[in-house]
Amino acid sequence: MTGKELDIQRGKLPAARIAITVLAAGYLGVCLVPCPLARAGAERGDSVQQTSESWPAYGGQPSQDHYSSLTQINRENVQNLRVAWTFDTGEKGSIESTPVIVGRMLYTYTPSLKVVALDAATGKLIWTFDSGNHEPDASRGVSYWTDGKESRLFAGMRNLLYALDPATGKPIESFGEGGYIDLRKGLRGDYKLQSIGLTSPGAIYKDVIIVGGRNPETHPAPPGDIRAFDVRTGALRWRFKTIPEPGEPGYETWPKDAWKTAGAANNWAGMAVDEKRGIVYVPTGSAVFDFYGGDRAGDDLFADCELALDAETGKLLWYFQGVHHDLWDRDFPAPPSLVTVKRDGKRVDAVAQTTKQGWMFLFDRSNGKPLFPIEERQVPQSTVPGEATSPTQPVPLLPEPFTRQAVDEKTLTNRTPEAHAEALEKLRTFAGGGQFMPGVLNKPTLEFPGVGGGAEWGGSAVDPNTGVIYINANQVAYTTTLVKNDLSAGVGIRTYRGQCAVCHGADRKGAPPAYPSLVGLFDRMTGPQVAAIIHQGRGRMSSFPNLEGTKLNALLEYLRTGADAGASRDSASNVGPSVPAVADEDSEDPDAIAGADLYTARCSLCHGAKREGTPPSVPALLGVGQRLNASQVTDLIHHGKGAMPPFPAIEDPELSSLLRFLGVRTEVAGADSGDAASEDPYTITGYTRFDDAEGFPAVAPPWGTLNAIDLNTGKYLWKIPLGEYPELAAKGMKNTGTENYGGPIVTAGGLVIIAATDFDRKIRAFNSRTGELLWEGSLPFSGVATPATYMVDGKQFIVIATNGSRDQRSSQGGVYVAFSLP
């Protein structure tokens, strides 16, 4: 491949790209939008400042540096750490949350999306907030705001953002709609058919909370607007559109009418805030569909971008696009870290962004100028009809990649001769093997690093005193197979291929534990339960409230039998109780509906005459139609939950009337929602990890690493394997590294502390200067999260969430563990 130095070869760009980078100040792909940047620190103010003892924000502080100035736990005594307390949520499922600690209060999530406040010194439960939405989700933390007089805690519950009183956990009714706002509102189309959720907590700046969201990765998907809401009222303060409309910068990088239908280009990874400059740095992901872009020809700004936005107004200051016309799901996967580095004897405030490709980009915070050279390199072109691949992609020259960049015969596993031979045989059937190989029809395309990075959502840690960044990374390969979508097939299989096969595979077998098998699903669940998961989502799965009527029934039949029900067959009778036909909550006066009498007789004793409930023990039913759909509420009514008894005798027409009274909406059963969800010309057959016959990676170790890079020079200080498989270690194959999710923290005590490894149930502390392992502690389950550290009553603690959800070989739970010195 030939490279083009960004600062001298900009004139050789294709004309379409020149048009959008004409203001690039001599640097291709980094665009400056004229805007006054100078802001006095006193004018901006600091909405959240980390004291030496607290951890008041996701990532430690708004800069996302994962740094603590605490030194009580240090290199000399870290080996003496012991368990100080544990908090067992009593639940099983994924916890990826990093607690926020303010004073002696610790705020975090349980696997079922309850928010809890604990005594940070003892782990004692102080309060619980239960929204009534118990479907697991990848919620990685809460946001804390204070102006010194009042304070608020913000918690995402899938499509809702709640404002809670940090002292009591009760919703603040003056915020939004009685304590929450619905993030689906204000996007494109009918918000009740949209799906969005807060994977990462919002960023706080002054008196606004800035949010992105996780969007579906298939059509239809809402646009990935970045929005700021007033922390007191919930009112929208500003919006930045990542899919530009006519007249907006970047519009020319899409087809003419793409803004009407294109989706995602969203921020799910989190953000960093420079409070003195008043800038929020926003990494975005790819546009849908992830693996085929024939309907979005062009570079697709502002997908896969690092955005610098004025945090006061949302105005674009500069951007850098890391992947043009993404066909590989190469989202920027983590919030950037703010750091100050030395350049030519001067200190330069910088922003560091890690990538799934195993790269790190470093920019001047003020103007977006790259601090290390970046080349636009020619890349392979697609042979798929209708596709229009970008001719080049940007590649940083420094630092060198923190993962290997390709797989070949020399880099396959040598765990056993048989494993190597099997891996070699598979490799010869694949296309690709490295970066930016477009999908080839009907042939597995090998992607390395895989869809899980490189770097991932845990983010990086930066020591502000040295300018050294610490990054954990995955080094396993995945394959995807692009296939033509048979539009002559029936509704069930077309809907499955369009919405489900991306994760669960064409054969419904998935890639456990991340993507569970759907074979035999109806042996474990009822039809309404499956429909509820489809409509609300679960874990990393987005919700699909747009799937109703014929499409939903046909999909359920296909999931139940593996046979397609076809376009004309209504299979609701085969999958359990039918979904009652319910009018839109806005179309009728709830008090005029006959269901009011049934509610008074059966529900009001617990939930109150005005549906207000007594949270958290008895949830309010006000607005339940914005949290749950008809399938979910029907399932709760018929089967009960917790202290609520079942009411199986409530059936239509009384059931429909009750649901109307509660404001619960769905389409009429049998109606077609009319979207184009299954009409993409191509889809993929799922994510498949390149493994040997025994389930270990088919590439050579290390399979996971921890890396230290001096950002002043771009040079590595050290690189070590991170994690191991206990069963391999028992046979003498140690320090292989494993897949790891969650990030590190770094302290003034000279330590890098990280759990993250999928299989060995360990948390470790390393010498930040040398990478030497100084301590490891055992956990009840794997700690797939980023730890936090803080001091209460003169004692420093390290706390980590554990759950085991990524290890199908072992049990799961939901336990927080805190360590301290004796």
Residue ranges and their predicted role:
Residues 19-34:
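Bacterial N-terminal signal peptides
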Residues 1-16:
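N-terminal secretory signal peptides that target proteins for export/translocation
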